[in-house]
Amino acid sequence: METAFSHPPQSSSSKRKVIAVVGGGLVGSLNACFLAKRGFDVEVYESREDIRQAKVVKGRSINLALSHRGRQALKHVGMEDKIISKGIPMHARMIHNVNGKRSPIPYGKKGQYILSVDRANLNKELLTAAEAYPNTRLNFNHKLHDWSPKTGTMTFIGSDGQKTETQADLIVGCDGAFSAVRKQFLRQSRFNYSQTYIPHGYMELTMPPKDGDFAMEPNYLHIWPRNTFMMIALPNLDRTFTCTLFMPFEDFEKIRTGDELLRFFHKYFPDSVPLIGVEALKQDFFRLPAQAMVSVKCCPYHLFEKCVLMGDAAHAVVPFYGQGMNAGFEDCLVFDEIMDQFNENLVAVLQEYTRVRVPDDHAIADLAMYNYIEMRAHVNSKYFIFRKYLDNLLHFFMPKTIVPLYTMVTFTRTRYNDAVNRWHWQNKVITRGLWLCGFVSAAGGTYVLVKNSHKLPSISAEQLWTRILALKLF
């Protein structure tokens, strides 16, 4: 019996396949490069106008952190060097305390860094790269209205309201968290889907240059952690910083006037006020309402042999691990590797892609949720900082045995799911080791005290307790 996610026999036709990429954003445009490089006829359909010609760029503008996974995908299509040249290295987190003190926390080993890149510029570069292939065509102002999972026929609505039909051998849905392609999946049985909005929104502010240079150290991801909310700042090539305030919606709604805004910032982010500027802060804050963030999970990623989901269409993640774009780019690379493995047999390729990629993408979605708590709360903890240094120290002496989670996720292509499983195992080992060290130290101290008790001055239990309290240990 055939289900929506089983496959009828594939045609043995030798005709080159037509692949439709729905969505001309970051993942869609990179995917077009991968597929065109293989010799497929690629049609890219984007609902918006060409971002390279738009006077005003609509959509999200949160700065992006490009790391190893994304770079490997770009390298595969010859784009890594060009993109890196327009990025700014960030070697560590810079933690800003309320009192103005700054403390760096390195991301990894010396020489390891992530890159701050501009979303719009990256999208433009990838579209231009895709368009350079003679077997690729970009179609803008084409909004997907419906499509058939049986025939691969798609209906688009143009900017003039007219409908057009076209057909493809494979439809690749790269059209974001609110994917129109994915709607067809929802009509099928045995398709699992969930979305979760977090109770926090985000708002972007701009920190201008100071005396023609960066207002803060540029090679850091700056973080102002405040337990239930936080602000971050990433550097831009024009020497500005894009600051993003993440906070519960109800807290945003409490700030209604410029005076309330200034009181809030002077209380929680005092060092940022003179750097952003009072008037600029007010203008940016009240320009637009706080934006929502959603996490999307679904399974499987393919439908018959006609369609596959990638990027946010398959796994939108909240932006707190800096892996949303990197995971989407790795989707393209993994799909390409599986195409090699199965000699471009789409029946086998799509099934394997779902099998391999779903657990990894779900793992990074969960990690992104966890990391929000870490970024806004745990980085203030002395134990957190101690564990970071301990993990890095153990990694230095035992590089193959102990690998920090952030290192596995950001600086390697270890599968996300494997990284999480290994992290849990390492935590158990390290925690038990710390408890053992504590027990041995306590036992050793007790033994020394007992052995030398006759040398100690006589003191009552009440006096001993009073002296302990005086040390303010509790």
Swiss-Prot record:
Domain of life of the native organism: Eukaryota
Keyword Transmembrane (UniProt): yes
One GO cellular component, as annotated: mitochondrial outer membrane
Compartments it resides in: Mitochondrion outer membrane
Family: Belongs to the aromatic-ring hydroxylase family. KMO subfamily.
Role this protein plays: Catalyzes the hydroxylation of L-kynurenine (L-Kyn) to form 3-hydroxy-L-kynurenine (L-3OHKyn). Required for synthesis of quinolinic acid.
Entry keyword annotation includes Transport: no
Annotated EC: 1.14.13.9
Main localisation: mitochondrion
Reactions accelerated catalytically: L-kynurenine + NADPH + O2 + H(+) = 3-hydroxy-L-kynurenine + NADP(+) + H2O
One annotated GO molecular function: kynurenine 3-monooxygenase activity
Protein name, per record: Kynurenine 3-monooxygenase
Required cofactor names: FAD
Membrane topology: Multi-pass membrane protein
Alphabetized PANTHER family for the sequence: KYNURENINE 3-MONOOXYGENASE
Keywords: FAD, Flavoprotein, Membrane, Mitochondrion, Mitochondrion outer membrane, Monooxygenase, NADP, Oxidoreductase, Pyridine nucleotide biosynthesis, Transmembrane, Transmembrane helix
Pathway: Cofactor biosynthesis; NAD(+) biosynthesis; quinolinate from L-kynurenine: step 1/3
